[in-house]
Every structure is written in C-alpha cells, then in structure tokens.
Amino acid sequence: LNKLKDSFYTQGDVDYAGRYVFTGYATDKPLTYQSDADAKDVDYTITQNFTRDALSSKTVYTNAYSNDDIMNLSVKKDANGKIITPNVQTVHRLQLAYSEVDANGTFKITDSQGNTASITKNTDGTISVTDADGNAVTGVTTNTDANGNITGVTGNFFSDGSGNAVTVSFTSDTNYIPGDDEIVINSQVGEVLLGENVYKDVYTSNSFSVQYDKSNFKKGDVNPTMYFDCVDNVTGVTYVKKDEDIEYNINFTQKLKVNTQADEAFNIYFGRNIDDLTSAVQNVLDIESQMSKVESMMKEERYSSDADQKSLSDILEGLTKQQELAKSQMTKAFESGIGQMQGYQEQISNAKADVGNRITRLDLTKSRLTEQKTNFTSLKSENEDIDLEEVVISYTSAQLVYNAALSAASKVVQQTLLDFIG
C-alpha cells in the first residue's frame, strides 16, 4: 500500500524537455520533495478550507487493551467490578491533508460564523488563544487532566450551533472521543475531531477553516503550494492557490491550454486514504501481537498463580473480542477504499479526457489551417506561376482588339446628318 502511494505521486513528477508537467507556472519545481535533504528546511503555514463534503467519520475503540494493561495484568472492569469487553464507537472528523503537523504551533480555526481564534500550544505546555486581530481572548478556561497536564481550553470563541461554549483540546490518543461541544486536534495523525453539536453546525453551514504549521516534510511528501494557500515561514513568501493555465496561441485570436495542474489529476487525499488502510491493517497485526504476548505470558512460571492466570485469561478474552472488531473495521475500510479509489481513478480519467479534448481541438485547428494553406497556395499558383510569353501574347491580342474597337467607334461618331442627306 505504501508503495502504491509513492508510485501515485511519483507520476506527478514527470517532466518534458526539463520542465515539470503538473506544477503550473513553477515548471522548475517537482510535485513532491525528491529527497529528505530537499525537504529538510521546508516550513509552511497551510490553510485548508472545508465544506460538508470533507466531513467523514472514523471508528475508535473503547475499553481497548494497551501494552501497559497487559504487562500490569489490568483487566477492564466497570464501577461495579464487572469485566467489560472492548467495543467501537464512531466519531466525526475533518482529516487534514498531512499527518505529523507541528504540535507546538498555532492552529487558526474559523467557524461558519466567521469567528476566528488562534490556539497556540506553547513548548512549556501552556495554551494561549488570540482573536483575528492578534488580541488575547478573554473568558478562556484552561482544562487539565488527572495529572495536571493542560489538555485544552474552553470559551465562547466558536459556534456550536446552539450557543454553548466550545472546548478546543489537543490529544495524541487515536481513540479519543470528543464531547458534544468539543473540537479536538490530533497533530500526530493530522485530524480535527468534532463533537456532535460542532459537527451539526459545520454540516449545516457548510463552512470550516483550519490553518496549521508543518515543518517536518520528508522525501515523497507533496509540495503544499500546489494545493493550498501557504506562507513560507523561512522566506516569508505567501503563496495563493489559483489556476495557472499555460496557453499557446494556435491561431488568430485562438488560444489552447497546454498543461494540467496537479490538483486536477492527483488528489492529495489519496495518500491519506492509503494511511487509513495501512492503519486498519496494522491495528489487526498489533492486536495479534498482543494476543501472542499474553499466550506467552500464560506459560511463564512467574504468572503461574491462579490470580495471574485468571487475569491473563480475561485479557485474552478481551483481546479476542478486540481482534474481531478490528478485522471487521479493516474489512469496512477496504470496502470504503474501493469506492475512494474508483473516485480517484475517475478524476484521472476526467483529466485524461480533458487532454484528449484539447488534442482534438488542436487537430481540428491544424486541419483547418492546412486546408487554408492549400487554398492560398493554389490561388498564389494561379496568379503567379504562369507562362510569361503566353500572357504577353494574350495581352497584345486583347490590346489590338480593344484599339480596333475604339477606331471603329470613332469613325461612327465622325459621321453627321448632312453626310446622309444628299
């Protein structure tokens, strides 16, 4: 799957006569970074605008067993001490175009009402919030976890559609479940999770914007300036995404577009969808590895007590349930992936059809110009490519006839009425 992703974007790096085909006016730049050295010093602030079409869902696991749970023989139980098994739950998300975005950076979020807040996670763990003008937002509550670590902020800087204060949180937990009025940023996987009320507001208003920083690009990553509005944090240059059609004059007052831009053929989310598939597969493999670990521990002497064996047996039972859920989710991911891949294939087919249409127009223009050239060549031949002696003879003959006609006419005019009376 990873090779498929690499191969897909590599096609966007093709060049003709030393100029890259899919990068608009920047024909000297490839679509992807060709090496880690090329990507080393790249640092962009990227702005992505979303509509309801970008909303998707993901499956998270509840009561799932971690490696620490296994090593500590921690069996999942409810408040009454009853063993509970892993389960799944669906959460709403907006998937960013990139994973591994900068965690200690600024996330500028604009909701459907135009409310803008810049949430900065500082290196010391604190979180600061500023408005669109850069002023500190008042009335913000800082949230912490059980260990006192800051997890997010709550305030009235966004709309959830019902007037409630919205919480913006940061997490690295891939199984995090947001509250109804919560926006959760997972910079590691490049996701913005939306609580139920926030999701409904985004879906109804059809508008949401996220601005984020990314500085850890690597070989094979797509250049963001080809897809989004960006600011180069190294040079300060601002890139505004717009159509960069290269046109040639092929006839009088007739131009033809000769290039295809990357976003017209190569969907940047192809790679993210591949990431979802690999994640689903890896999750199954990880659970199988955990099950093998538990089975191995059950054979060890130090876990031979009845209590330890009971705990390991309960954990193994939970992992078995977790494995069934993971395999089911993997199947659904691949079923969904088939439809997504068909959509990407259709996008490429449409781009190819557009190129074919332009080739047809060019051929028609060429045929028409060739016909016009033939007609003008024929006319030129009829007017210029003739026998000079024959022309002189014809001209002299015509001149004699003309002069004779003039002479006869003059004699008739010289006669008067008196010449006929007598």
PLM region descriptions:
Residues 1-124, 132, 193-195, 218-271, ...:
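Amphipathic alpha-helical coiled-coil/heptad-repeat segments
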Residues 1-33, 317, 321-422:
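Amphipathic alpha-helical polymerization modules
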Residues 7, 35, 56-57, 66, ...:
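Generic serine detector
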Residues 37-52, 182-347, 351-354, 373:
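Polar, low-complexity export/assembly segments characteristic of proteins
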Residues 156-166, 221-229, 380:
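Short, positively charged
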Residues 169-172, 233-235, 348, 386-387:
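Intrinsically disordered, low-complexity segments enriched in polar/charged residues with Gly/Pro
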Residues 178-179, 242, 394:
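Short, small/polar residue-rich loop motifs at catalytic or cofactor-binding pockets
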